[in-house]
């Protein structure tokens, strides 16, 4: 999946940047959507590239990173600024394991998955950041998927997990009602 995101990390920890158009596709999606956006990415290098590209086009005040390297004392301020409709902070770029739990980001009208993981709980929790009490607008969800790659397999696995959960829960509900 790192290759689909435009780089490969060697066993020694060196990054090799690869040609890819995922960042271009992200910028196209961002340009097509007005309003605030949450962008989830599972890789630090990807988060840094997203920040760099968004900052170049929209300015430093419009972008905030929220992942493991983000200082604890800065995290609450980032959320507060993102939730302020008058704040210039338009893009919340984060790792779903860091920002996907326990925070409210319902000013977002778009949620973009730059990369996904097989972790359904993390996916559902990160989706719920934009759907909280107080959300008044509809939210658009976008998965950036390179055709014929691991991206498709991951999203298919997530859908299968949701379908399985629905079947199990529905069966349990039916049994409980008897």
Which residues make up each language-model segment?
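Acidic-enriched, low-complexity/disordered segments with a strong bias for Aspartate over Glutamate
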Residues: 11, 19, 61, 74-77, ...
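A conserved SF2-helicase RecA2
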Residues: 118-178
């Amino acid at each position: 999946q790192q290759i689909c995101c435009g780089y490969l990390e060697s066993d020694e920890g060196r990054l090799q940047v690869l040609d890819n158009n995922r960042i271009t596709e992200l910028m196209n999606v961002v340009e097509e959507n007005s309003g605030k956006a949450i962008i989830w990415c599972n890789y630090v290098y990807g988060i840094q590239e997203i920040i760099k590209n968004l900052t170049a086009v929209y300015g430093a005040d419009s972008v905030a990173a929220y992942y493991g390297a983000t200082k604890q004392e800065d995290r609450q301020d980032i959320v507060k600024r993102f939730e302020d409709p008058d704040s210039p902070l338009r893009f919340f770029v984060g790792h779903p394991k860091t920002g996907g739990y326990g925070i409210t980001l319902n000013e977002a009208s778009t949620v973009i998955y730059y990369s996904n993981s097989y972790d359904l709980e993390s996916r559902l929790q990160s989706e719920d950041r934009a759907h909280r009490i107080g959300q008044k607008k509809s939210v658009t969800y976008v998965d950036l998927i390179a055709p014929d790659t691991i991206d498709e397999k991951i999203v298919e696995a997530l859908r299968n997990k949701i379908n399985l959960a629905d079947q199990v829960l529905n069966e349990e509900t039916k049994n409980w009602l008897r």
